[in-house]
């Protein structure tokens, strides 16, 4: 389904009752073909969605609420357009469910169907809100660098690495990631963490490259996959993982993770800006 046919940028009608048909899937294939991915994926990973505006009625009509987390596998054929996700979650507000498990099972069934793959769902009830973490991405900050730049469209030629020197292992972070919604043009603000083993990447060039997304239009997942592939091709690391955490919009934040080696799922701890 084409993003232009999604609810983005259109007048909003909020559903009075639960409605799974509100979910609008968008195939990943189109954006991946633009990146040269036409067969096996050169990475694996997950898109972590956090939903902070989920509420429903119990069997007696009393409102209930929870924070929901969805783990969408990167190999799923579809993503879900974010405004449609918001409208879908909003449709729960005046609908009755017998239990928290019933809500979770419904979410898992519907979102898995839209994505075309099994999606894991976690719900955190209010009495466990104190357990939710907040911390910044770990790593050496690239933003400490004082530099000039004037490139605001993705330019992989900014990337380089010391190919003749011994490999290193580094974790680098930046809070200066910005891209833009391809339908509405609204800015998406994010932080990005890059962990790699291989020839040392030039830090100034990497920061300029991250900044170069500032005028780029692309969904969160697509931007992270482009970052991953550009670093992989230009710098040739032996191991690479890219994790971005984008700020919240419409009660949802999206946090894509891509890697080419086995490692634990990153912590789903929201940053201060989230």
Curated annotation (Swiss-Prot):
It is found in: Cytoplasm. One of its GO terms (cellular component) is cytoplasm. The keyword NADP applies. One of its GO terms (molecular function) is preQ1 synthase activity. NADPH binds at residues 82-83, 249-250. Keywords: Cytoplasm, NADP, Oxidoreductase, Queuosine biosynthesis. It catalyses: 7-aminomethyl-7-carbaguanine + 2 NADP(+) = 7-cyano-7-deazaguanine + 2 NADPH + 3 H(+). It comes from the Bacteria. Substrate binds at residues 80-82, 220-221. GO terms for biological process: queuosine biosynthetic process; tRNA modification. Pathway: tRNA modification; tRNA-queuosine biosynthesis. Catalyzes the NADPH-dependent reduction of 7-cyano-7-deazaguanine (preQ0) to 7-aminomethyl-7-deazaguanine (preQ1). PANTHER family: NADPH-DEPENDENT 7-CYANO-7-DEAZAGUANINE REDUCTASE. Belongs to the GTP cyclohydrolase I family. QueF type 2 subfamily. Homodimer. This is NADPH-dependent 7-cyano-7-deazaguanine reductase.
């Amino acid at each position: 389904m084409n993003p232009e046919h999604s609810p983005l940028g259109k007048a909003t009608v909020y559903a009075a009752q639960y409605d799974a048909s509100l979910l609008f899937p968008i195939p990943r294939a189109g954006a991946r073909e633009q990146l040269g991915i036409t067969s096996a994926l050169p990475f694996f990973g997950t898109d972590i969605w956090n939903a902070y505006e989920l509420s429903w009625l119990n069997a007696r009509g009393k409102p209930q609420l929870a924070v929901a987390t969805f783990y969408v596998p990167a190999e799923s054929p579809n993503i879900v357009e974010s405004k449609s996700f918001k409208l879908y979650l909003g449709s729960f507000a005046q609908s009755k469910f017998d239990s928290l498990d019933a809500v979770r099972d419904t979410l898992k069934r519907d979102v898995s169907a839209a994505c075309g793959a099994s999606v894991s769902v976690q719900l955190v009830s209010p009495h466990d809100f104190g357990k939710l973490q907040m911390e910044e991405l770990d790593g050496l900050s690239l933003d400490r660098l004082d530099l000039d730049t004037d490139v605001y469209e993705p330019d992989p030629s900014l990337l380089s690495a010391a190919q003749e020197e011994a490999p290193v292992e580094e974790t680098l972070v930046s809070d200066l990631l910005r891209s833009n919604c391809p339908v509405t043009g609204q800015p998406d603000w994010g932080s990005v963490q890059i962990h790699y083993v291989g020839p040392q990447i030039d830090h100034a060039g990497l920061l300029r490259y991250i900044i170069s997304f500032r005028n780029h239009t692309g969904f969160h997942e697509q931007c992270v996959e482009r970052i991953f592939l550009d670093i992989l091709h230009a710098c040739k690391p032996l191991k690479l993982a890219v994790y971005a955490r984008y700020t919240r919009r419409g009660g949802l934040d999206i946090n894509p993770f891509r890697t080419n080696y086995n490692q634990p799922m990153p912590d789903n701890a929201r940053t201060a800006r989230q």
